[in-house]
UniProtKB/Swiss-Prot annotation:
Cofactor: Ca(2+)
GO molecular function annotations of the record: glycosaminoglycan binding; metal ion binding; N-acetylglucosamine-6-sulfatase activity
Organism of provenance: Metarhizium majus (strain ARSEF 297)
Name listed for the protein in its UniProt record: Sulfatase ppz1
Cofactor binding note: Binds 1 Ca(2+) ion per subunit.
Family under the similarity heading: Belongs to the sulfatase family.
E.C. code: 3.1.6.-
Length: 424
């Protein structure tokens, strides 16, 4: 798992080894529910977590160790291959999570700087620039919140962003080397590789200059919420591109299912349909940080409530670059907004089944299973009158439940209008 890797800025195009390593597919092998984490560590720890050439680590709860002059991603690669070798020798099922910091920004104290590549990669891609997509350095009609007042980027700012982008690509080359080392170890044990699932992903997306934003990751735009996710292993079709929406709440349920481990009721997510028998099922999208995405073959919407209590509604079939705050859908906009607001309220503090099946949580009678069902005029009063709205009393620097307004919706048909229990 990389740190803050984009999809829409094309960083994967500069990682041929990572892409090639996930081209193939291993045959089916027996599953085993007794998987173990072979060892614990090393773990990158502050103050050197995001320092590329003086990382601070702890191994198996031992003493802290600094590694001046050693490149962080290479340290992670060497330890990972060592752990993998130990796990293979043990002859037992294992789980290995590998999390280099690239392409995260270099962070020393409060300073936020461009990523630092390994010396061997620092002269690559010198002519590459941030992709000049239609949203680059462009405002958006109808934008709200701080997007509304962002000034046009100056030439020196754009030059800095191009340099920042190149440094991200350069730092990812050591990740490619890491993947190559891990694959070489697995390929030297074909029987292990044939029964091992591999995943490549990131924790966040990233933007650089889109909508006039400086480098960052905390917005609800496509660049931030879409991330790489590549899977390889028994039963996963080679070269297949899945179009179903998922989130990282689905990762653990997916791993459990592939390993033959029973799922837990408290899981917020559900297994991804990575194999053919699941890919025919509809998958529900969940996004619970005040931005909601509903995505199907027939319609796709993004609905956002800002801490200023301003609202955005985008028809993503019409414009997936957020060029205007509007929709051309046949749905009535006020009625649609009311449904989406209630769905967002259901998800903003959900847990367990409420995260996986929000419509069924709202309508336990089972007569509403999606947005089209919810748009029935018979439910107008329920959505427009009975429901509280997603609101904020003020803008906070972080999550503060006291300013979040209502945390859960009213359930349809509940005599006492009892709301679902929110996550604490």
């Amino acid at each position: 798992m990389t740190d803050d890797q984009d999809v829409h800025l094309n960083s994967l195009d500069f990682q041929p080894i990572s892409l090639l390593s996930f081209e193939g597919v291993a045959p089916y092998g027996p599953s085993c529910a007794q998987h173990k984490c072979h060892r614990c560590g090393p773990v990158l720890i502050d103050p050197g977590t995001c320092v590329y050439n003086n990382a601070s680590m702890v191994l198996d709860n031992g003493a802290w160790a600094f590694h001046p002059g050693s490149y962080s991603t290479d340290l992670v690669a060497n330890r990972s291959v060592e752990f993998l070798g130990d796990a293979i020798k043990a002859g037992e099922p294992f789980f290995l999570g590998v999390t280099p910091i690239a392409p995260h920004a270099e962070t020393v104290g409060d300073a936020f700087e461009a990523p630092v590549p390994a010396k061997r990669h620092e002269n690559l891609f010198l002519d590459v620039k941030v992709p000049r997509s239609p949203s680059f350095n462009a405002g958006a009609a109808g934008a709200v919140g701080y997007f509304r007042n962002l000034p046009k980027l100056a030439h020196d700012q754009i030059d800095y962003m191009d340099t920042f982008y190149r440094r991200r690509l350069q730092s990812l080359q050591a990740v490619d080397d890491l993947i190559e080392d891990i694959m070489a170890k697995l390929e030297s044990h074909p029987d292990v590789l044939a029964n091992t699932y591999l995943f490549y992903t990131s924790d966040n997306g990233y933007h650089i200059g889109q909508h006039r934003l400086p480098p960052g990751k905390t917005c609800g735009i496509e660049e931030d919420v879409n991330i790489p996710f590549i899977a390889r292993g028994p039963g996963i079709a080679a070269g297949h591109v899945g179009r179903f929406p998922t989130s990282h709440t689905d990762l653990v349920p997916t791993i459990f299912e592939l390993a033959g481990i029973p799922l837990r009721d408290e899981f917020d997510g559900e297994p991804m349909p990575l194999k053919g028998q699941r890919q025919s099922n509809d998958a529900l999208n969940r996004n619970t940080y005040k931005t909601l995405r509903v995505d199907t073959d027939d319609y796709a919407f993004m609905y956002t409530v800002w801490c200023t209590n301003e609202h955005e509604l985008y028809d993503m079939k019409m414009n997936n670059l957020y060029g205007s705050n509007s929709t051309t859908s046949s749905f009535d906009i006020p009625q649609l907004s009311a449904r989406l607001d209630t769905l967002l309220l259901t998800l903003k503090a959900c847990k367990g089944i409420a995260c996986r099946r929000p419509w069924q949580t709202l309508f336990p009678t089972g007569n509403v299973n999606g947005l089209v069902d919810a748009m029935d005029p018979l439910h107008d009063s329920f959505f427009l009158v009975s429901q509280p709205r997603v609101t904020f009393t003020t803008c906070s620097l972080g999550y503060n439940a006291e300013v979040e307004g209502p945390l859960s919706p009213v359930i349809f048909g509940a005599a006492d209008e009892t709301a679902i229990e929110p996550r604490q």
